[in-house]
């Protein structure tokens, strides 16, 4: 049976400042840790990215033409405060005013994120969110933006607190490139959640008219053998690292007994301890019912198997299928079942996982209010022919995920919109320019945009709300 979505559903496209803007040192922008880290460790940099800094009128005109009525944008913190605090860079402020004005002119509602992986270098080198001083700097930056940009109706504090801790301190593919430090992972999660809570409370206390939430990446975790209690435990522990710890902080205002028991077990196996303070929990408690919405980024699920050995993680950054490895001491290892398809980057394609995660949020955290799917899409080595890309695989991927959204809505979940990652091709943090996600193909040499087959398909779905 053909599935449909509600008439008021937002069909959006997602971007991020550092992945799209380029212009990394233009008009007074301060450095971020990624600038040097990419030069030192990867085969690409964030120049020119998609040159969104100059090309945003083109991208927003395409959005309007192709029925995209929402856009995720992030503000580059170091465009506003080049060192993270102190003097304001007025040219950066002016850029975002012009960008938001263009969004509204094109009837594309901006959903604006304050932090999308790009802490200013001065604060990053000072410990990033492991340093509690930077909680204060973030809250002050948020306060400035809330006051300066009243034209923004939808704010999110952070994009993917989980993958930030994961990328920086577990996998080590984000600066500062530390591996296997689980205590730092959890401390980063916690301190960022405290930062989120304080910013949300401030927003509500000031009585601003818009809405505010947070974007979490929530990959669903399953036991490889549901009948094997050790596999079930491995999936539970992996879920605590990536999902439950953060969701508890967001919606309970504390960490449940089960969550903390898992954290203690993981740290007993891997070393380290956490600094969790009473005032932190006061901040979390004060904000737990103030979130207007939850953004869920969902690309994949994982299957976990019990494992007795040392931690080893190999990141597949070049799309060499089968080259990744993930096993954590005292937790488990990822083993993909044969029946699930995978991308060249070993990401497991499993739309049912999105349904299961939405229903988990609905059932376990009933104060969630509403959900937007803030990222979902398929990374591909797109073939550019006839001035387009015949990306049937991407269409199929998005179609399947929209269908499970329709099912979740039918089953009582309040899902209000979907943002495809990404609106146009952007650069990928740890994969470069080869891994493309956009509805619009970007020739990174000329910065020309070309609609892919998926753009035409998405336009039709947005117009009719019928998924076919």
Swiss-Prot record:
D-galactose 6-phosphate binds at residues 19, 116, 159-160, 297, 428-429, 435, 437. GO terms for molecular function: 6-phospho-beta-galactosidase activity; beta-glucosidase activity. SUPFAM superfamilies: (Trans)glycosidases. Keywords: Glycosidase, Hydrolase. Pathway: Carbohydrate metabolism; lactose degradation; D-galactose 6-phosphate and beta-D-glucose from lactose 6-phosphate: step 1/1. Belongs to the glycosyl hydrolase 1 family. Its EC number is 3.2.1.85. One of its GO terms (biological process) is lactose catabolic process via tagatose-6-phosphate. It comes from the Bacteria. It holds the Pfam family Glyco_hydro_1. It catalyses: a 6-phospho-beta-D-galactoside + H2O = D-galactose 6-phosphate + an alcohol. InterPro entries: 6P-beta-galactosidase, Glyco_hydro_1, Glyco_hydro_1_AS, Glyco_hydro_1_N_CS, Glycoside_hydrolase_SF. The active site is at 160 (proton donor), 375 (nucleophile). This is 6-phospho-beta-galactosidase. One of its GO terms (cellular component) is cytosol. It is an enzyme of class 3 (hydrolase).
